[in-house]
Amino acid sequence: MKIIIVLFSSFLLYACDNINSELPPPQDGGNFFYPKIGQSIVYDVEDTEYELTGKFTLKTYQLKEVNVSTFKDLAGKEVLRIERYRREKRIDKWIIDSIFTAKKEVDKALKTENNVTYIKIFFPIKEGLKWNGNAYNSFGNDSYEMKKVNQLFQTNGRKFDNSVTIIQQNDSTLVDLKRRMEVYAEGIGLIYREEIKVSYCNSKDCLGKGEIDFGTKHILKFKSNE
């Protein structure tokens, strides 16, 4: 009887090893968020402002984010210093716009801008994962959700095989749209950002047609990296 039990136990261990070997390795997702020191990324940006008069103003410019250096915070954790530059046209010189920081911890990625910290990504990455992006600031609960994990994403004529989309807000009705989302690519970082806050025409002749009365749109797209 002991021999049978031993053999059966060995079979179970062998079977479990085979099953585990076929499972994909866990992916913490750290390589999606500011993965390289010294890396710089150029973005094309479009800001659109809609007025009640029916007119709209479109501004286009470029931003460049440079992962400059790291330092230790008061808790001894490594923090990344990022410099952001701006230019109105491609022929213009880059001018420093702002400086902010980012930090990757065991279970999350943090970004601090204008002294406000946000939880941008949670690790390990997982489809449908939700968290409060404002947990480290005083702005109140802001539910983020992770979608389209490791899926292809296309923007600005470029394809990224492994990306993850973070939905920060997606409230849509017949009379308005409030949407915020960011997309990160493995080995690169942020490749797309969308912030839309518009109100639609709600009179009888245009209700439900998606005609914008007023509001703003901010679209940021990956252009190139170095």
Q: Where are the language model's segments positioned?
A:
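C-terminal motif of bacterial Sec signal peptides marking the signal peptidase cleavage site
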Residues: 13-15
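Conserved functional acidic sites
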Residues: 17-226
